[in-house]
Amino acid sequence: MYDYIKGQLTKITAKYIVVETNGLGYIINVANPYSFTDSVNQLVTIYLHQVIREDAHLLFGFHTEDEKDVFLKLISVSGIGPTTALAIVAVDDNEGLVNAIDNSDIKYLMKFPKIGKKTAQQMVLDLAGKFVEAPQETGNTKARSNKAGNTQLDEAIEALLALGYKATELKKIRAFFEGTSETAEQYIKSALKLLMKG
């Protein structure tokens, strides 16, 4: 098992980042790949969780140990796999998540992709009271120069599809942001807030 990796961030895609260390490039699935944009070709530390399957060894990465802790709690719930947990972490509203779990807000929990009523109820059953305090929001929120356009929106939509959101939902998101100019990371954060509002 791995705790973290320290190396050079060499690539960003809609689903994952690549960190090179000792001549090897590690594919790491992350909640919002574009939150790492400022770190391309720089030394980064990514906290890791490894999932071993018959057909693949997968790495899931996080900005902070708090973000990783939320992910680990989520995958301990029956019905929540790593991809779904990553989509929940991507919303970057841990306070809202913890409040929903502690207050049995099933409707809020069902707004996450691939979370039905049964799984939402299981989340409450398994995780209520398990978060001593809501961790700080975990994404990289550094302001950046505004160099976005439709390409940035396209990348954001692609990343949201990878998180499990439906194309029909994302058509509305695209229409909402058409004509605006943001980074892919900012589009993703704003879109996730809109999707959670329903």
UniProtKB/Swiss-Prot annotation:
<dbReference type="GO" id="GO:0006281">
    <property type="term" value="P:DNA repair"/>
</dbReference>
<feature type="region of interest" description="Flexible linker">
    <location>
        <begin position="143"/>
        <end position="147"/>
    </location>
</feature>
<feature type="region of interest" description="Domain I">
    <location>
        <begin position="1"/>
        <end position="63"/>
    </location>
</feature>
<feature type="region of interest" description="Domain II">
    <location>
        <begin position="64"/>
        <end position="142"/>
    </location>
</feature>
<keyword id="KW-0963">Cytoplasm</keyword>
<dbReference type="Pfam" id="PF14520">
    <property type="entry name" value="HHH_5"/>
</dbReference>
<keyword id="KW-0238">DNA-binding</keyword>
<dbReference type="InterPro" id="IPR013849">
    <property type="entry name" value="DNA_helicase_Holl-junc_RuvA_I"/>
</dbReference>
<dbReference type="GO" id="GO:0048476">
    <property type="term" value="C:Holliday junction resolvase complex"/>
</dbReference>
<dbReference type="InterPro" id="IPR000085">
    <property type="entry name" value="RuvA"/>
</dbReference>
<comment type="subunit">
    <text>Homotetramer. Forms an RuvA(8)-RuvB(12)-Holliday junction (HJ) complex. HJ DNA is sandwiched between 2 RuvA tetramers; dsDNA enters through RuvA and exits via RuvB. An RuvB hexamer assembles on each DNA strand where it exits the tetramer. Each RuvB hexamer is contacted by two RuvA subunits (via domain III) on 2 adjacent RuvB subunits; this complex drives branch migration. In the full resolvosome a probable DNA-RuvA(4)-RuvB(12)-RuvC(2) complex forms which resolves the HJ.</text>
</comment>
<feature type="region of interest" description="Domain III">
    <location>
        <begin position="148"/>
        <end position="198"/>
    </location>
</feature>
<keyword id="KW-0234">DNA repair</keyword>
<dbReference type="GO" id="GO:0000400">
    <property type="term" value="F:four-way junction DNA binding"/>
</dbReference>
<dbReference type="InterPro" id="IPR003583">
    <property type="entry name" value="Hlx-hairpin-Hlx_DNA-bd_motif"/>
</dbReference>
<dbReference type="GO" id="GO:0009379">
    <property type="term" value="C:Holliday junction helicase complex"/>
</dbReference>
<keyword id="KW-0227">DNA damage</keyword>
<dbReference type="GO" id="GO:0006310">
    <property type="term" value="P:DNA recombination"/>
</dbReference>
<dbReference type="Pfam" id="PF07499">
    <property type="entry name" value="RuvA_C"/>
</dbReference>
<comment type="similarity">
    <text>Belongs to the RuvA family.</text>
</comment>
<dbReference type="InterPro" id="IPR010994">
    <property type="entry name" value="RuvA_2-like"/>
</dbReference>
<dbReference type="InterPro" id="IPR011114">
    <property type="entry name" value="RuvA_C"/>
</dbReference>
<dbReference type="GO" id="GO:0009378">
    <property type="term" value="F:four-way junction helicase activity"/>
</dbReference>
<dbReference type="GO" id="GO:0005524">
    <property type="term" value="F:ATP binding"/>
</dbReference>
<keyword id="KW-0233">DNA recombination</keyword>
<comment type="function">
    <text>The RuvA-RuvB-RuvC complex processes Holliday junction (HJ) DNA during genetic recombination and DNA repair, while the RuvA-RuvB complex plays an important role in the rescue of blocked DNA replication forks via replication fork reversal (RFR). RuvA specifically binds to HJ cruciform DNA, conferring on it an open structure. The RuvB hexamer acts as an ATP-dependent pump, pulling dsDNA into and through the RuvAB complex. HJ branch migration allows RuvC to scan DNA until it finds its consensus sequence, where it cleaves and resolves the cruciform DNA.</text>
</comment>
<dbReference type="InterPro" id="IPR012340">
    <property type="entry name" value="NA-bd_OB-fold"/>
</dbReference>
<dbReference type="GO" id="GO:0005737">
    <property type="term" value="C:cytoplasm"/>
</dbReference>
<dbReference type="InterPro" id="IPR036267">
    <property type="entry name" value="RuvA_C_sf"/>
</dbReference>
<dbReference type="Pfam" id="PF01330">
    <property type="entry name" value="RuvA_N"/>
</dbReference>
<protein>
    <recommendedName>
        <fullName>Holliday junction branch migration complex subunit RuvA</fullName>
    </recommendedName>
</protein>
